[in-house]
């Protein structure tokens, strides 16, 4: 990048200051006539003193050199530190990305494992279901075949004679049939095989029908009935008759037993499937019972569980049902389930139609209940929004209805799966905005996506981490340290609950919402009694604390060492003022001091925190929340003490101890945010304060809202109640005549909880490439990353005009860049110009146009961008993108554009408008330090004269009065700028003095320019624009030469060489004159005036026709030459690396071309030099290439051709030189013939001939050294 002027200028300023000091030291007061007669000792002293400045000069130079070295080292260290910080940031970002990727991979692997485990579990369940279905099918099929073939296989009469027919055993067996269980299958089967029950069939049938079976016992009962049916022919008809009578008797029951109905229906279906009843008898009985159940249950659907049980266990055989779960398992795992072959499809169809009708009525009931539930929820939300809470009856009614709806929904889903039907659509009712308050987006932690911190619970990410991310003590602390503690806490809590149940209802420590409401009502009714109760409560509280203190002191006598540890811990607790320290303290307490007495000590220490240390409350609350999973009694005891202290202050109703009250309320709020203090209790505390909204209660309510109001208002479960209380508070503020201080506090608390909605700005959508360009320029660009950004910018598709225009536009809009990074954009542009020349031109034009547009529009909303543009223009000069003429033209425009010469007000520059002064100071502060030598120094001196006149003209306007004086910050800004640029400048003290300086300056330059100042002095330039143009011509090509002669780098500006510094130092010493300082005016020399007069009185160019003809002819010749050269072919020169001198000497010192072996070797080979690099060192090796190779032959031919061309050019040059010498010799002879020849006194020394026309000397060119004779 181009070398900055900043380094050189600072060094030159120091040199100028040192030179001025040296001059001041060297100057001596002129010796008067009275002081001339002095002793010789004084004269010698003066000579010794004259040596002092030289020593001082050397010391100052050494100090200056040391300072420069220190500054250079300091800058290098800063650069290294910045690079290290950047590397650290990049490493941290890489680590974060790696951690995120690792977490994502772990989550993905965990998800895949869970999916695989779920799939494996599903497969196992499907296989188990498949196996059970086939086993059940085979068992039923075998049992059905046996029962259908029973008439042919029943035993004869002689078989029964061998069985036991005793009354005792048979009656005992019949009694056992009333309590059939699956566990008794074997014993009952064994007893049945040994008994003759021919005379007890009726009793057995009655016992079986009246038996209280479970669903798991139905298979055992069906097995026993099969045994009866296979042995006794009259068992099945008797059983069928009893079942019919049993069902007829059940129709008369008002409240049938659903469990018995479910098992009976399943029992009949099982008896029909296994063939005890015929299909006609059994199916008709099942259909009648099922139809009666469904018809009686079409509205209430209380017997839906009976239908579901029937479909689950017997639906496949009776109704031909295939559940959706079975279908999906068969399709997914390619399983074949047993077909329904027992009953024909024609007999199954009525059951299917009946069940589908029932499911239709069930879905209608579900939709109806769903609508009613939504209506109830909507009404409850409205009541909460209006009143803040629900009545107990309504809340209980809603919970019961919601439970019945959930049960109905689950039954509907089960029946839909069994019938392979789809569930109906149940649309969710979207809450209206009015139900949540105006424009409030309630924060729900379960929502996917990022946290919306602007509309969420917490103010920022740090607050969220502080209140939510707590350390898990159970992961660090051994479980044995708090396991017993948890057991004891559970026992204590159980004892406390039993004690509280026995206590009377007016217990003061009750914390339920109802008790708080009762206390609130009592507050409103009986004020005097409450004050007494509050006093008694305070006494009880202090007694309790004192008793605990005495008890602990007695315990401490036995364990003094632990007491010292606990005391040291409690003393250091107020020093835990950050998250790490308080977390460490929590872990320390849990590891080393976890006893019941120490926990009480900790609670008391937290409770009696000093009222001035409000900063400790969030950390103490975090300590309590961290300890809560391991020792919950700390949070419970502290909350109960704070609750009691709060009620004491509310009931006391005094106007003292406001700091203690605020401390208690703030502590409650902090514990609420950690969810240690319940939201209901916090809201009821706020309600108690609002009930008596006066004096200290106002401050306490506002403090509570400012601590946890946003948390309560943004939480879904407490939003409605909080909004009602906030509205109540605002209504009380309007109705009551409160002090202005209280009004401000109430409004601040309200708007902190519920800030007014802000309009969200719509972000403009841009193409990705434009977004990347803006990211590079506006985010990534910094002093350290300039080189990287330049590399990325060079990779852009610059051939695309749209991309180039957008980059130029982004650079012109410099106000989008951070103010401290504007110089980085100028640095970047200077490096980019080497590859894209037109970009720099367009950017400079755009910046100048924007500055001009700002002066024309002159609106305050553009002031910041105008400051940035002015700063950018100065930085462009620092990086040699513009010349000084552009800077001074802009500065003069600030003091002249739109300014009326007569001083009348202008709309472009109003009297009270001082922003142009700020723009001038901004440019001068940016690049004015480089105008310290040469013509640019004189230009700045001249401009400062006009600038002072502009400032004093602004000060003299009538707008500024004693009541409304001229802004003092503008004066300070001007003085700071001028002190930096011209420390010795003499400022004007009035408008007249500034005008007089301008007139003197204009008159002086008019005289120097040799112009007549009679008329022109009257019409002289008002603001020095013509003067600036003349000075630009006077500066000549020095600026452009300086601009074009230096290459640019990206990282740091180039360091100037020592020779340039010496030349600039000499120039500074020669031109170290200031037109505005008194010393410079006094030290003006006659030599400078004479030089100026020579410039003014020199030859002047007179335009004539011959000049125009000459210019036209020259242009024509140049054009023809260009056209001729464009048609020629361009010959590409071959690269020929020069051989080092020491190798040339070695080659020349080789063997001569004489005879012998050396001659043959040199004739057969040609020496070449091979260049190699090893590390940073170059190595040369001589190779003798044979002449037979193509490389040597081509090189030899090329050398011969060059030698011939060289000899031809030499001969041609010699001929020209000889011809010119002959012509000159003839002219000399003619001139000598006209005048006598001078005597040659030195014949032996022949002078070298110098050709008057500058002809070349061939001997010098070709180094022949010979003489022509």
UniProtKB/Swiss-Prot annotation:
Residues 1025-1073 have a biased composition (Acidic residues). Residues 168-396, 571-755, 774-984 form the MIF4G domain. It is found in: Cytoplasm, Perinuclear region; Cytoplasm. Residues 94-132 are annotated as: Sufficient for interaction with UPF1. Residues 1081-1269 are annotated as: Sufficient for interaction with UPF1 C-terminus. It comes from the Eukaryota. Residues 57-133 form a coiled coil. Involved in nonsense-mediated decay (NMD) of mRNAs containing premature stop codons by associating with the nuclear exon junction complex (EJC). Recruited by UPF3B associated with the EJC core at the cytoplasmic side of the nuclear envelope and the subsequent formation of an UPF1-UPF2-UPF3 surveillance complex (including UPF1 bound to release factors at the stalled ribosome) is believed to activate NMD. In cooperation with UPF3B stimulates both ATPase and RNA helicase activities of UPF1. Binds spliced mRNA. Disruption phenotype: Knockout adult liver results in hepatosteatosis and disruption of liver homeostasis. It comes from Mus musculus (Mouse). Residues 1102-1126, 1164-1204 are annotated as: Interaction with UPF1. Residues 755-1269 are annotated as: Sufficient for interaction with EIF4A1 and EIF1. Localized in male germ cells. One of its GO terms (molecular function) is telomeric DNA binding. Residues 427-438, 487-511 have a biased composition (Basic and acidic residues). This is Regulator of nonsense transcripts 2. Residues 1102-1195 are annotated as: Necessary for interaction with UPF1. The modification Phosphothreonine is found at residue 1085. Keywords: Coiled coil, Cytoplasm, Nonsense-mediated mRNA decay, Phosphoprotein, Repeat, RNA-binding. Residues 837-857 are annotated as: Binds to UPF3B. Its main location: cytoplasm. Residues 709-926 are annotated as: Sufficient for interaction with UPF3A and UPF3B. One of its GO terms (cellular component) is cytoplasmic ribonucleoprotein granule. The keyword ATP-binding does not apply. Found in a post-splicing messenger ribonucleoprotein (mRNP) complex. Associates with the exon junction complex (EJC). Interacts with SMG1, EST1A, UPF3A, UPF3B, EIF4A1 and EIF1. Interacts with UPF1; interaction is promoted by TDRD6. Interacts with DDX4.
